[in-house]
Amino acid sequence: HLMYIFIALSMTKNVTFCFDFGSPYSYLAYNNLNSIREAGGEVTIMPVLLGGIFKATGNQPPATVQKKGEYMFKDINRWSKKLDIPFKMNPYFPILTVPHMRGAVLAQRENILEKYMQVMFEAIWVKAMNLNDQEILTNIAEKSGIDPNQFAEEISSDEIKNKLRENTEFAISKGAFGVPTYYLDDEMFWGIDSVKFLLDDLKK
C-alpha cells in the first residue's frame, strides 16, 4: 500500500495559482480551477498584491490605456460567456485590494481561503459591490467565517503583512508581471488564455 501511495504522490503535479481580487481575470481563473484539478493538478493558492507586481516590473493596469481598457471589458465578457461564469463589471473599479488580500492570507491561515475567495470574488465581480468601503469589506469577510474584530486586527499585523509581501516577492522572483499567473514547477503560465497550455502539460 505504501508503494502505491508513493507512486501516487510522485505523480502529483503541483500548480501554484497567484491571484488578486482586483483582477477580473483572476475571478474567472478562480472559477476555472476545477479544470486544472480534473487534469491532475494539485492546486496551491497564493494570494499576491498585483500593485506590488506592477511596481516591481514597471507594468501598468490595462485600464490605464483607454483603448486597452475598452477591449479588456469586451474580452472579459467573452470569457465569462465561454466559461459560463456570471460576471458584472464593477462600477467602483479599480478596487484597492491591500486589505482584501491580507484577509486572504488570514483566511488561508484559518483554513477557509476558498470560502473567503468565493464570497469576495462574488461581491466584487457578480454583485458589483463597493469593496473600497471598509464596512462592506468587513461584512463580506464575516460571511466567510472571519470575526469582524479579528479581521480588523489581523490585517494590520506584521505576520499577515509580511506573508503577503513574501508571496508577492516569490511571484516576482518566478517571473510574474500580472495575474492570474500559474506555475507548474518552474514553468509559468499567465492569463486565462494560457490555461489550455497548462492543461496540455498536466496531461503529458
Q: Locations of the language-model features?
A:
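Short, Lys/Arg-enriched N-terminal segments with co-localized hydrophobic residues
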Residues: 1-10
